[in-house]
Amino acid sequence: MRTTDMADELFRGPETELPAGVRLATAKRGGVTVTRVEIAREGLARPRGRYVTLEMPSVSVLDERDTDVIETGAAELRALLPPEGPVLVLGIGNRRVTADALGPRTAQKLLVTMGPQHTLPVRGIRPVAALAPGVSGDTGLTLRQLAAAMVDAVRPAALICVDSLCSAEAARLGRTIQFSDTGLHPADARHARHLDAAALGVPVIAAGIPTLMDADEGADLVLTPRALDSVIAHGSALLAGILNRALQPRLSVAQLCWLTG
């Protein structure tokens, strides 16, 4: 089987055929299919924890104004987050490589509420900081070193890592969003992007959209969606809209668009 970061691609079929310790449930919300996978034990294809996948029409035709998708995604993401406390968002990836630019592009669109310009607390506004740490070739530091330094500086209640994901199915590229509370654990062992609570001492939520797939098992070749530029542009806007709504539930989608536009 080709490499995949998507938990629902690994565990499918009737409940009686699922491995022991795995639960799967699917529901429709408007035009969005929500699949929840809960892995209750170690030793399976993905780390123990909760995974939520939203499946929809291509994100290349959606953006931060698509209220139904944003409300559905925000509710699912909010359920994985601590109810209060500062949140640090890291946009993982290389902004110069289109298929890997989802994280940095998403971080640019977030409503940041920490820093010198936000010295006075506003009732109901959650403190949020965002950063695109770049790649080790540019910084000379590993992702884990940078993440640990940022966590030490911000002292967040949770860390959200946004990254491009890998799917095993071409039809799902640019059409799904996955959230998980397991941290960042790329299925491809060649990627050194592993961040989790054990390494950083805070809950780590992973969020992403699949933008590539292996062309063949064991080959150094990947496939990307035909409209990749549009997938990254619209997908990052949609994902930022979901994160903003999840982190600032007292602000409407329209208000968040105005504040970040």
Mark where each language-model region is.
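A glycine- and small-aliphatic-rich helix-loop capping segment at beta-alpha/alpha-beta transitions
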Residues: T72, E76, T98-G115, T176-H185
